[in-house]
Amino acid sequence: MKSYTLNNGVSIPVLGFGTWKAENGEVAYQAVLEALKAGYRHIDTAAIYKNEESVGRAIRDSGIPRQEIFVTTKLWNTNHSYEEARQAFEQSMEKLDLDYLDLYLIHWPNPKPLRENDAWETRNAEVWRAMEDLYQEGKIRAIGVSNFLPKHLD
């Protein structure tokens, strides 16, 4: 499968299997297993999808070496501080039951609770710092953002 190389040298498959709306349990488990059997090597989930346990179990049960599967999960809107981001990451890793994560994303740039007084900008900077620390600690191979517009990155 074709892949792209990220700025830090990590290779990411261009096509990923998304698990949004895949109900935790047998539905998500079977969906991910079948996607992997069909040749997908990038699995995308998120804390808010509430299916990380099934996604992780399917990855482990697939028989495909972990290093051949690119796994992405995302930080939800309610965890936008340094400590909350680190705790949320650890919770996701516990549910996924994986040794490392390939890509961790801030799911949304401007959560409703943080819109007053542009608090989201400060909070996202804290979250980014936490993600950089997790990256430096070797727990994440790459970090990034999801659903951001150019104005959110200025």
Residue ranges and their predicted role:
Residues 13-26, 74-83, 113-122:
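Active-site mouth loops of central-metabolism enzymes
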Residues 1-69, 130, 136:
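N-terminal binding-site loop/beta-alpha segment at the start of enzyme catalytic domains
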Residues 20-22, 46-48, 74-78, 106-109, ...:
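Active-site beta-loop-alpha junctions enriched in small/polar residues
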Residues 12-16, 41-42, 68-74, 100-105, ...:
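Structural preference for beta-strand elements that scaffold enzyme active sites
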Residues 23, 85-154:
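Glycine/proline-rich, positively charged
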